[in-house]
């Protein structure tokens, strides 16, 4: 298959996975994950910070966990279509995706925009790599992030 990106929002932190997401059962993303659970997540914030992570996703129908993580704004994504399809934690359409991270790369830009511009021009002139931030890598494909 092909790699696909989908916009999704992290849910609050909870035991059982490094990251949690909520979605509707029976969608293409659920089918894709059941076929191949390997995932890649990317985050970019304010032009400064960037995170890239890869891991294994697991689809969860655990109603206790759904109740624990439930937020009322989920109702917007699960419109009422008759009992029990009402966007509440007992709505059978709601499933969770738990992701266990195995590798991650973090970049934090520490330089201001003028310094970044200076560093880029300096790099063009000198051939040196611009110094605009720091990178941290966590990479152990055999150990979930929770165990490190």
Model-derived regions, located:
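An N-terminal domain-cap segment
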Residues: 1-16, 32
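A generic structural motif
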Residues: 11, 42-44, 107
């Amino acid at each position: 298959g092909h790699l696909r990106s989908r916009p999704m929002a992290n849910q609050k932190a909870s035991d059982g996975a490094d990251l949690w997401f909520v979605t509707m059962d029976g969608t293409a993303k659920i089918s894709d994950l059941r076929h191949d659970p390997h995932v890649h997540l990317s985050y970019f914030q304010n032009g400064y910070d960037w995170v890239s992570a890869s891991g294994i996703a697991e689809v969860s129908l655990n109603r206790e966990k759904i109740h624990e993580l439930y937020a009322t704004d989920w109702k917007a994504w699960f419109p009422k279509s008759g009992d029990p399809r009402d966007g509440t934690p007992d709505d059978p359409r709601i499933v969770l995706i738990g992701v266990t991270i195995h590798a991650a790369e973090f970049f934090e830009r520490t330089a201001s925009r003028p310094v970044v511009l200076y560093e880029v021009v300096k790099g063009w002139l000198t051939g040196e790599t611009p110094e605009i931030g720091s990178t941290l890598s966590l990479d152990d494909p055999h150990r979930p992030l929770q165990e490190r």
